[in-house]
């Protein structure tokens, strides 16, 4: 169990986990609020 805990706390595993979390969060935000970036700029 200690070896698994050591492996999961290494930098590449934590970085990939963080990137997957951020990507999923951005996908869900875009699903509920589509085109949020384009709505902030007025279109004339």
Swiss-Prot record:
Signal peptide: none annotated. It is found in: Plastid, Chloroplast thylakoid membrane. GO terms for biological process: photosynthesis. Gene3D superfamilies: Single helix bin (1.20.5.510). It is a single-pass membrane protein. It holds the Pfam family PSI_PsaJ. The keyword Ion transport does not apply. InterPro entries: PSI_PsaJ, PSI_PsaJ_sf. The chain crosses the membrane at residues 7-27. GO terms for cellular component: chloroplast thylakoid membrane; photosystem I. Keywords: Chloroplast, Membrane, Photosynthesis, Photosystem I, Plastid, Thylakoid, Transmembrane, Transmembrane helix. The keyword Membrane applies. May help in the organization of the PsaE and PsaF subunits. Belongs to the PsaJ family. This is Photosystem I reaction center subunit IX. It comes from Larix decidua.
């Amino acid at each position: 169990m200690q070896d698994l805990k050591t492996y999961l706390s290494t930098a590449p595993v934590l970085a990939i986990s963080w990137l997957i979390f951020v990507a999923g969060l951005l996908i869900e935000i875009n699903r509920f609020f589509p085109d949020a970036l384009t709505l902030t700029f007025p279109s004339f």
